């Protein structure tokens, strides 16, 4: 099978060896890319629309989250195996390209320096290694934290440490943060304040991290969060 790709905007290139389009587009707009596949049986063509704008994820995030399958048992090897399965099964090529590690990737307590620590028993090579593994396969890494001092599972959350946690996540190559609301006050004003704090911290890192809030809908986040604080939210 041979592939030809034409109409790529400036900044993008197609690698025929692995079939991945890579790069970065600086100009906003919609770009129509023409793709043709050909083998001894014939050929077929289709188009791909690439949307570029100032906002992240102009289309919905699609992918996999570890929680319902593995819960607290998530570990590095499982994540890598899931990533490989998403590629080999064709899910990645259909747009399911986020691999999200939910609760329990972190230690129960912070380090003496106040930094959030990756659980080395579960992720012996660290999250940077996991991110690199995913990125090499055209996938994105998502992680989880909470707008309280503890997550839903009882390990350390990010409240009060938004900037240092965001900085560490960006340095690891994280592409998405799911931000829960367990253990936090129930009023809307506090939710807005805590989610805004992490949103600003992520923007300060200068890395494009999708901020996905998970407050279950009780404070009507569709009125104040989407497009202002976050780019995705939990829908029950």
Name what the model sees in each region.
Residues 20-28:
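Extracellular/luminal low-complexity segments enriched in Ser/Thr/Pro
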Residues 29-33:
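Exposed beta-strand face motif in extracellular beta-rich ectodomains
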Residues 35-37:
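Conserved structural position at the C-terminal beta-strand
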Residues 42-54:
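C-terminal edge beta-strand
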Residues 51-76:
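An acidic-aromatic substrate-binding cleft motif
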Residues 68, 81-82, 86-188, 194:
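Aromatic-lined carbohydrate-binding/catalytic grooves of carbohydrate-active enzymes
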Residues 161-164, 203, 210-236:
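Glycan-recognition surfaces
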């Amino acid at each position: 099978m041979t592939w030809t790709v034409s109409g790529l905007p400036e900044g993008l290139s197609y690698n025929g060896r692995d079939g991945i389009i890579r790069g970065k587009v600086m100009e906003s707009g919609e770009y129509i890319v023409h793709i043709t596949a050909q083998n001894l049986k014939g050929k077929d063509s289709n188009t791909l629309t690439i949307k570029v704008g100032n906002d992240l994820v102009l289309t919905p995030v699609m992918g996999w989250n570890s929680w319902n399958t593995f819960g607290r048992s998530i570990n590095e090897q499982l994540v890598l195996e899931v990533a490989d399965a998403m590629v080999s099964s064709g899910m990645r090529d259909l747009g399911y390209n986020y691999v999200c590690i939910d609760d329990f990737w972190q230690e129960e307590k912070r380090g003496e320096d106040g930094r959030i620590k990756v659980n080395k028993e579960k992720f012996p090579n660290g999250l940077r290694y996991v991110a690199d593994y995913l990125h090499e396969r055209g996938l994105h890494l998502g992680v989880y934290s909470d707008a309280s001092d503890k997550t839903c599972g009882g390990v350390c959350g990010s409240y009060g440490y938004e900037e240092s946690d965001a900085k560490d996540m960006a340095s690891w190559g994280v592409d998405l943060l799911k931000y829960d609301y367990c253990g936090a006050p129930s009023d809307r004003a506090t939710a807005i304040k805590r989610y805004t704090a992490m949103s600003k911290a992520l923007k300060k890192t200068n890395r494009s991290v999708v901020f996905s809030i998970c407050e279950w809908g009780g404070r009507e986040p569709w009125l104040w969060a989407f497009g202002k604080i976050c780019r995705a939210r939990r829908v029950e």
